[in-house]
């Protein structure tokens, strides 16, 4: 546990004490901005240290402006993954097309680093956030919130509310403390949300897929590239973020109902994934074997969190805890960064009641727009039927295949001799290729880009890696987001 004084505090009033549960992305980002606005911040995290490693994630659109204002953009640019090739394979392991990843992913790529989207390892982002704030706030590792108690306050009209005069927190480690506000930044399966709003099922929107992600030895000589195998309803991908001796492996499959029981048991999880890919070819059998032995395996369902409100009394939610968009949108990290920025800015000169209301008013439409990206590109990129798969492959070929690598490494892992292209219904979407549709029309060789890869990138100040909201909602978000910059300048 460390604590130092805030570098600069422009306020003369006593600093309000706040607790943030979760030290992933949203938590440290929120801590940074609340500290900037004069709050005394404590962050509690159940892990023993800041979590490192993790799969690649995107930082794009408005989130780029947030990290620039935090001063960590240069560090993230240095950590940029720079994927150079995306190879699509058919059910037999044969190459369908090899294209520029930015064409498929819809990211903004160009010579100007100010507008170029970033792809970094999750651990590189969390490390940058932690480093930016660790000397200015208190961190409690190896601990978590056990209970939250908001004293009930009665008004003159006889109505009761949870606003009270603070939040009494009991930690699992046995400590007890009082805070002016508490924030849940504890992810998709948030305990903070459950304690305040009830079971996760009330807000959980299952999207029809299950996925597994883990690392395995890079025995394929892959470098800065992605390889994805498809059959209807199933996808397997290998993602080499550099020249490392390991690659990220993804297995995704469609399932009509969430396998709730299997997710509670690690061995049942592995059996579930193995059964879904029992007849798969290419390198999938080897991936299944590696999954069995992986010590960093993560298996879950693809889902969103949708809530009618993000706060109760003096407690508010941010990031995945409030509005997880799912990895199918590619916006989870960016929404966490932008949401933290907007929440802190809303509290810069307001009490919790007015601040939480402003947070929702100015951010909700932006969140909804990003969550609704689901389904815009996945049907074309990850088809559910054999006919749709063939149509997708034809469109990929129209993009123009990149020339073969000039070295002597294999262009792809050798296909399994007994591979078959069968599969169950539905479709799966690995995070190595999210479904954004923002790439400008036209490919590098001048060929016409299919409509599912097309779309002019909107103004950076109004997007989070997606289309602008449009209309009053767009203007409201952009105006409020910009106003926070003026406030920051005034306080420096």
Model-derived features with residue positions:
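Conserved N-terminal glycine-rich FAD pyrophosphate-binding loop of Rossmann-like flavoproteins
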Residues: 49-65
